[in-house]
Amino acid sequence: MLEVVFSDSEKGSIRVAKTYDAKKMKGGAVGYIGEKPRKAQVKKLLAQMEQDLEGHALGGSSDEVVNIGFFLDVGDISGEIDGIGRRNVFRTLWSRFHFREEEEDQLFTEQRNELEKLMAFAEEGKAIRIWVSNAPYSICGLL
């Protein structure tokens, strides 16, 4: 199943969720305020925490996640999704970082490839799940 998101951060999170394995992804920290708890109490709390955090992978390949970004919550969205208007929005938003033209081209090529991957899945009748939040970029991406 292809997972569709509208930000790089969400893409990374869903990629991890597709292949989640609790045994391989242990980690974290526990702190306490006040008196040091007894070992038995700590053991009980850690066991409860593990149970509470137990999860299961979404399944599938982490390659089956696309980000349809294009900064659609900013500027005029009446033009082509990766046209000059979108590039101008990108330049306005990120100009302080002095991206080289090749880096900008790479970003838009990757975005175009992800859009084409979505279209291919749709044309082949494959399953697609769209993850939407109430964030403006997400709503605009869905539209």
Task: Enumerate the language-model features and the residues they cover.
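A structured, charge-rich N-terminal accessory region that forms the first stable segment of a protein
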Residues: M1-E101
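Short, conserved acidic/polar surface loops in the N-terminal third of protein domains
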Residues: I77-E80, I139-L143
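Long, hydrophobic/aromatic-enriched structural stretches that serve as scaffold segments
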Residues: S95-L142
